[in-house]
């Protein structure tokens, strides 16, 4: 969902010399290196367009990509003869990977094979310093030593809070639905805004002890709305790798400067974190490990507000949309969860709630976050594809792995791979292993150098399933418009972007 980055190196030519050295191909399963030569007849070069150094086209291509990502990739794949590996230039000159085999290969590589672009966090976007100060945005997963050390110690901090997750979830969710019974939606009818109230409360009580547990109140919710808006362009800046396009992008983004009110809200949240009962212990824990703690509260704020609470609230848009468009499944799911206590223990695995579990994994499959990842080839490589074709990539080139497309590969998920099927995994639970959940190929091995931290500490599946299940138990709703669920339009998302409730009522009596 979020992208951060600095300007990429100029894309080198893909033409191989007559006597090319061996190119390494890495097995996605065993990571065994075997040499293949560029002279092999089945080794292909990606086709497509990388724009000239002084072109404005990366900006116009980026706009087309952002506006209708599904249409963009349909056109790209068609223009390249159906190839699942091809070149494109939406802000950065990249080689796209768009099928299951190439995505699995991408996720499986060690940092000496594929690494984040030097200094980059999410690819072509970077977070504005007004939000993170001098800190690195945590969990960004680039392999710079300072980040990797910080990530490991933050995971240790988060693990120390695992015993408090259940009480925080119970308090936040009970409060959220009591407010619904008492006040309806109030001022927050946009789906993202509505659920952000719940996710902000949960994350800040769980990680910082704010709210019910610690007795210290949360800052006003309007501060979180100001600091974590649905239009995230106010937090992020787009980077281009051609000077003309980069200048045009910066001029266009001048109107997106954070306001004085937004900056005051950021400071309000940062101060609440610094003042929490647990913060001094966090800082001491990290200082004892020689971690630079300058602006550390802003790094944590970026994690709990933007990457966690904001991401879960945005993820509720496809949840609401797919349940709205599948009323028969919604009724079946209600029969499964009604009257049941949804806890981290009870929802573990699929045994107790097979429909809820399958729905959760289908959401993961079609609406992954992040939907793509950018990394740099640290050596000449060969990329496998689901069709059996192999493509060569040169050292220094950027690869953009499109996870949502890889998880809609019909060779793995069948002829209905581009359709939402909430019961897809009920009778075929092994198929879940083909979903790259939160950036992991192997769901049982979460100690990798990238991938979601909440999953790494064993919490994210439970968090999401409880939030989904409680919504089904607690609420009846109507939307202001029919949701658009089409990968030909909104890849890894649903439309419209400002999806809103016409009405939400409690299913439970006052």
UniProtKB/Swiss-Prot annotation:
Catalytic reaction annotation: (13S)-hydroperoxy-(9Z,11E,15Z)-octadecatrienoate = plasmodiophorol A; (13S)-hydroperoxy-(9Z,11E,15Z)-octadecatrienoate = plasmodiophorol B; (13S)-hydroperoxy-(9Z,11E,15Z)-octadecatrienoate = ectocarpin A + H2O; (15S)-hydroperoxy-(5Z,8Z,11Z,13E,17Z)-eicosapentaenoate = ectocarpin B + H2O
Please report which protein family the annotation says this sequence is part of. Answer: Belongs to the cytochrome P450 family.
Organism whose genome encodes this protein: Ectocarpus siliculosus (Brown alga)
Query: Superkingdom of the source?
Result: Eukaryota
Needed cofactors, names only, are:
heme
In Swiss-Prot or TrEMBL terms, this protein is called: Hydroperoxide bicyclase CYP5164A3, mitochondrial
Q: Where in the cell is it found?
A: Mitochondrion
User: How is the activity of this protein governed by pH, according to its UniProt record?
Assistant: Optimum pH is 7.5.
């Amino acid at each position: 969902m979020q992208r951060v980055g600095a300007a990429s190196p100029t894309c080198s030519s893909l033409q191989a010399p007559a006597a090319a050295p061996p190119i390494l191909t890495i097995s996605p399963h065993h990571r065994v290196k075997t040499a293949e030569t560029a002279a092999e007849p089945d080794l292909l070069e990606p086709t497509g367009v990388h724009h000239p150094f002084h072109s404005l086209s990366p900006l116009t291509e980026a706009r087309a990509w952002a506006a209708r990502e599904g249409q963009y990739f349909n056109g790209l794949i068609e223009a390249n003869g159906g190839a699942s590996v091809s070149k494109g230039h939406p802000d950065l000159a990249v080689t796209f990977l768009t099928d299951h085999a190439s995505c699995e290969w991408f996720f499986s590589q060690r940092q000496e094979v594929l690494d984040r672009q030097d200094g980059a966090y999410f690819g072509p976007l970077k977070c504005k310093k007004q939000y993170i100060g001098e800190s690195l945005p945590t969990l960004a997963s680039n392999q710079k030593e300072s980040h990797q050390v910080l990530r490991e110690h933050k995971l240790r901090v988060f693990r120390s809070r695992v015993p408090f997750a259940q009480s925080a979830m119970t308090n936040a969710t009970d409060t959220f639905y009591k407010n619904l019974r008492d006040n309806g939606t109030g001022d927050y009818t946009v789906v993202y805004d509505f659920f952000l109230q719940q996710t902000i409360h949960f994350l800040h009580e769980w990680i910082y002890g704010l709210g019910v547990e610690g007795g210290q109140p949360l800052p006003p919710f309007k501060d979180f709305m100001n600091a974590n808006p649905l239009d995230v362009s106010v937090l992020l800046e787009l980077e281009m790798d051609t000077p003309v396009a980069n200048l045009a992008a910066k001029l266009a983004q001048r109107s997106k400067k954070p306001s004085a009110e937004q900056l005051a809200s950021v400071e309000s949240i940062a101060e609440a974190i610094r003042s929490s009962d647990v913060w001094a212990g966090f800082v001491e824990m990290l200082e004892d490990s020689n971690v630079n703690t300058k602006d550390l509260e802003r790094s944590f704020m970026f994690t709990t507000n933007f990457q966690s609470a904001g991401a879960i609230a945005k993820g509720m848009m496809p949840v609401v949309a797919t349940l709205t468009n599948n009323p028969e499944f919604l009724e079946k799911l209600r029969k499964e969860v009604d009257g049941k206590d949804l806890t981290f223990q009870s929802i573990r695995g699929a045994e107790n709630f097979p429909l809820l579990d399958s729905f959760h994994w289908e959401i993961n499959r079609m609406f992954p976050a992040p939907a793509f990842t950018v990394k740099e080839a640290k050596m000449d490589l060969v990329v496998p594809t689901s069709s059996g074709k192999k493509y060569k990539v040169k050292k220094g080139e950027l690869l953009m792995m499109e996870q949502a497309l890889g998880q809609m590969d019909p060779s793995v998920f069948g002829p209905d791979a581009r359709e939402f099927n909430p019961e897809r995994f009920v009778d075929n639970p092994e198929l879940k292993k083909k979903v790259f959940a939160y950036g992991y190929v192997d769901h049982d091995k979460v100690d990798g150098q990238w991938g979601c931290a909440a999953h790494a500490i064993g919490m994210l599946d439970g968090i999401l399933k409880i939030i989904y299940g409680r919504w089904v138990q607690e609420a009846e709703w109507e939307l202001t418009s029919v949701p658009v669920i089409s990968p030909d339009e909104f890849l890894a998302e649903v439309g419209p972007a400002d999806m809103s409730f016409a009405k939400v009522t409690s299913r439970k009596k006052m």
